[in-house]
C-alpha cells in the first residue's frame, strides 16, 4: 500500500505520535489517536533519538495486533513506515522532520519470540537509557545501556542481503529452535534525518552483559594479512586476529563435553552458511579473566535527564536507571540477580546465551563466542578479489577470499584447534 502524507496543520496526534502539529505517512491502518505525554526521550544525537522513538512506536503498534498464527511470504516483504513533519516541537528533543521504517515487523517479532526475548524487555533494554558508542571494525556500533543488545549501522547493500536471506535464516532458526552461534537478528530499521538515510540492525550482544571481556579475537582461519595493526593493538580492548592468536600461543580452556557441543553447533551453522554461498564470516571470541574480573571497577555517573522516557507511544516507561546495569527487574538483563547470587566469573546462560564456562582450574573465567559478519555472499566482486589475491600471494596462500566450501573447511579446521 502506498504511503500518503497528511499536511502538518491538519494532522491529529497519532497513537504514539509526538504531539500536535505532526504530519504522518504510514502503511499501517488508522489507529486510535491519543495525546502525547510531556516528557520526551532526550538524546544528544538526533539519529539515536529518532531511532529510539521509532522502536517504541513500532513495539506499541505491534502490541495492538495479535501475532499471526503463521508467517506468510508477504511478511518477508512487508514494512511499516511513519513520516513526521513537526513544526511545533523543539529541536532539542527530536528533529523537526524525520522518517522511520521497520522492515518485516512480524518476522522480527517472531524471531524475538524464538530467541526468548519479550517485546517489552526489548523496548526497555533499548530505550530506558541512551545506548553508548563502542568501537566497531566498520561503521557505527552502539550498545544498549544494560549491555544486552547491540545496534549496528549497516549499508543499504547489507539490508538488501538481509532481505534476500531472511526467509532462509528464519527457517533455520525454527529448525534449530534458536540454538545457534549465528547472530540473533532482532530488528531491522531505516532512520531518515535531514534527508539522509541510516540503516540499523539490532542484535543480541554476544559478550556478557555482566562480565567484562579482557581479550578479544576475530578469527577467520586465514593467515594472510590477519594480524592486528599497531594502531589497533594500542586500544584498551583491541580486536586481535588469527596471527595474534597463534603468536601469543593463546588457547581456549573448556570441558570436553562443552567442546563437543560447541563444535557440533558450529559445524551445523557453517553448513547453513555454505548453502547460502556466504563467506568471510568470523568467530568472535571473547575471554573473561577471572582474576582481573574480580577487581572492582568504577561506576560511571548516570545522567538522569537523559534517562527520562515515557515511551512516546502510550507505553509508560520504567523510572530512570539508578546505579549500574543489571540491577533492574525489567529489560532483557533485569532478572540476573533474582534467581541466585552470582560469584566471580559466573553468568546466567539464559541471558548470556553465547557463553561457555571455562574448565575447572582454567586461567580464564568464561568464554564467549559467536559467528559474525554473515552477510557476505560469494559474488562477482569476491571472485575478482580471490583472483587478485591468488596472483599476489600464490594459489596455496591462506587468503580470506576463497570459495564458500573451501572457506568453510579451512575455518572449521582452524577453530577445531584453538582448544587446549
From Swiss-Prot:
GO MF annotation: an example: ATP binding
Organism from which the protein derives: Rattus norvegicus (Rat)
Protein's UniProt name: Phosphatidylinositol 5-phosphate 4-kinase type-2 gamma
Single Gene Ontology BP annotation: phosphatidylinositol phosphate biosynthetic process
UniProt gene name: Pip4k2c
GO terms under cellular component: autophagosome; endoplasmic reticulum; intracellular membrane-bounded organelle; plasma membrane
Main localisation: endoplasmic reticulum
Keyword set includes Ribosomal protein: no
Residues recorded as bearing Phosphoserine in the entry: 26, 349
Expression (tissue specificity): Widely expressed, with the most abundant expression in kidney.
Location of the region described as Required for interaction with PIP5K1A in the Swiss-Prot/TrEMBL record: 69-75
Amino acid at each position: 500500500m502506498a504511503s500518503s502524507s497528511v499536511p502538518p496543520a491538519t494532522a491529529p496526534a497519532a497513537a504514539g505520535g509526538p504531539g500536535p502539529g505532526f504530519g504522518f505517512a504510514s502503511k499501517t491502518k488508522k489507529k486510535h489517536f491519543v495525546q502525547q505525554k510531556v516528557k520526551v526521550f532526550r538524546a544528544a544525537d538526533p539519529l539515536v533519538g529518532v531511532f529510539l522513538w521509532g522502536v517504541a512506536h513500532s513495539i506499541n503498534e505491534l502490541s495492538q495486533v495479535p501475532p499471526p498464527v503463521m508467517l506468510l511470504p508477504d511478511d518477508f516483504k512487508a514494512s511499516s513506515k511513519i513520516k513526521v513533519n513537526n513544526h511545533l516541537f523543539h529541536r532539542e528533543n527530536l528533529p523537526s522532520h524525520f522518517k522511520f521504517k521497520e522492515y518485516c515487523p512480524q518476522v522480527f517479532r517472531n524471531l524475538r519470540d524464538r530467541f526468548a526475548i519479550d517485546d517489552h524487555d526489548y523496548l526497555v533494554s533499548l530505550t530506558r537509557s541512551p545506548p553508548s558508542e563502542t568501537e566497531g571494525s566498520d561503521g557505527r556500533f552502539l550498545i544498549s545501556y544494560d549491555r544486552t543488545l547491540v545496534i549496528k549501522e549497516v549499508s543499504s547493500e547489507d539490508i538488501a542481503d538481509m532481505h534476500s536471506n531472511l526467509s532462509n535464516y528464519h527457517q533455520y532458526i525454527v529448525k534449530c529452535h534458536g540454538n545457534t552461534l549465528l547472530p540473533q537478528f532482532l530488528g531491522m530499521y531505516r532512520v531518515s534525518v535531514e534527508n539522509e538515510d541510516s540503516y540499523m540492525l539490532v542484535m543480541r550482544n554476544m559478550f556478557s552483559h555482566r562480565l567484562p571481556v579482557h581479550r578479544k579475537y576475530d578469527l577467520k582461519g586465514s593467515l594472510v594479512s590477519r594480524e592486528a595493526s599497531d594502531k589497533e593493538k594500542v586500544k584498551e580492548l583491541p580486536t586481535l586476529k588469527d596471527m595474534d592468536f597463534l603468536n601469543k600461543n593463546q588457547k581456549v580452556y573448556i570441558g570436553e563435553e562443552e567442546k563437543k557441543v560447541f563444535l557440533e553447533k558450529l559445524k551445523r551453522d557453517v553448513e547453513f552458511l555454505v548453502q547460502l554461498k556466504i563467506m568471510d564470516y568470523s568467530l568472535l571470541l571473547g575471554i573473561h579473566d577471572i582474576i582481573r574480573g574480580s577487581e572492582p571497577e568504577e561506576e560511571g555517573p548516570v545522567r538522569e535527564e537523559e534517562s527520562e522516557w515515557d515511551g512516546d507511544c502510550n507505553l509508560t516507561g520504567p523510572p530512570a536507571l539508578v546505579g549500574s546495569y543489571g540491577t533492574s527487574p525489567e529489560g532483557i538483563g533485569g532478572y540476573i540477580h533474582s534467581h541466585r547470587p552470582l560469584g566471580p566469573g559466573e553468568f546466567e546462560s539464559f541471558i548470556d546465551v553465547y557463553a561457555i564456562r571455562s574448565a575447572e582450574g582454567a586461567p580464564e573465567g568464561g568464554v564467549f563466542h559467536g559467528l559474525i559478519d554473515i552477510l557476505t555472499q560469494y559474488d562477482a566482486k569476491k571472485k575478482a578479489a580471490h583472483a587478485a589475491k591468488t596472483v599476489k600471494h600464490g594459489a596455496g596462500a591462506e587468503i580470506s577470499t576463497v570459495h564458500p566450501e573451501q572457506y568453510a573447511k579451512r575455518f572449521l579446521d582452524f577453530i577445531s584447534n584453538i582448544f587446549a
